[in-house]
Amino acid sequence: MSEKILEIKDERLSFFTPAGEVKALNGVSFSMNQGDVLGIVGESGSGKSVTAYSIMGLTAYPGRLVGGTVWFNGHQIDKMTEKEFRKIRGNEVSIIFQDPMTSLNPVYTIGNQIVEVILLHTKKTKQEAWARARELLELVGINEPDRRLKQYPHELSGGMRQRVMIAMALAC
């Protein structure tokens, strides 16, 4: 039997606006075992992204979890401080954002952004991090990785930017 790695129980999340409370999630519950693949489908605005962001602890103000629990690997992550969460975010749990152009920083090269993630979550040296970044680009099917590491997000196609996001998620 597989080990349960993620469990969402009766998650409720609201956005508190000047016009009042907007309930974005109301009773979301699911669990995943190691090796599971989960597809969340729904209409635009149905809460798919809000669910993913809440699991990652990335709910933007004025959003707030108002009920339920989020468990990851036996830890109740919805009660973690930002400092505690930062230790697992990107290291044990990652998200691949739908629109890489809004997630990649336009003023830094692809290489700098991947290396930053590696250095933040591993004990690798800068040289080792650059070598790992190159390996990751190859792993996700980006040709000419040495050249791509020096490029900026706007210089890559949408599909290549998405692959860069996948490489960043795999970096740790």
Please provide the spans of the model-predicted regions.
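ABC transporter nucleotide-binding domains
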Residues: 1-172
